[in-house]
Amino acid sequence: MAEIFDSALRSHRDFAGVFEYDGETAYFYLYRNKNDQPGEIIGWIHIFSGTVDFDEHDISIVWDKNEETVGLFIRDQLWAAFSEPWPTKHGGNYVPGATSSVRLQFNR
């Protein structure tokens, strides 16, 4: 299976939500941007391992309207999120065909 990568940078350009599937394992990361210096991953959530049942068009990374939470949506369901205080974690463990267990107020 092909690799999948997607990200969304907050408007302040200080944090990004990043999804990465390397062909075997998928993670959702919270990345801290450091302007002209290399940034760092400050949080990670395991999404799944194994064969994927979706493609890059099914993935979206969205910041809420207050930019206090960044979420990973798979087929329009919120499967993982980071919220303030950074890096508070929610969700993970995607299961094909299942409904997400993440119950988080997410205002787009």
Regions found by a protein language model. Name each.
Residues 27-52, 79-105:
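Surface-exposed loop/turn elements that mediate protein-protein interactions on large endomembrane-trafficking
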Residues 3-22, 62-67, 105-108:
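Blade-terminus and WD-like Trp-Asp/Gly-His loop motifs, strongest in beta-propeller folds
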Residues 56-61:
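Signature of short aromatic-glycine-proline-rich micro-motifs recurring in repeat-based ectodomains
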Residues 1-8, 43-55:
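Generic detector of solvent-exposed, compositionally biased contiguous segments
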Residues 25, 67, 75-77:
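Surface-exposed loop/turn positions within WD40 beta-propeller blades
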Residues 18-23, 30-33, 73-75:
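Beta-strand C-termini and the immediately following turn/loop, strongest in propeller blades
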Residues 2, 8, 16, 26, ...:
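A sequence-composition feature that detects small, non-aromatic residues
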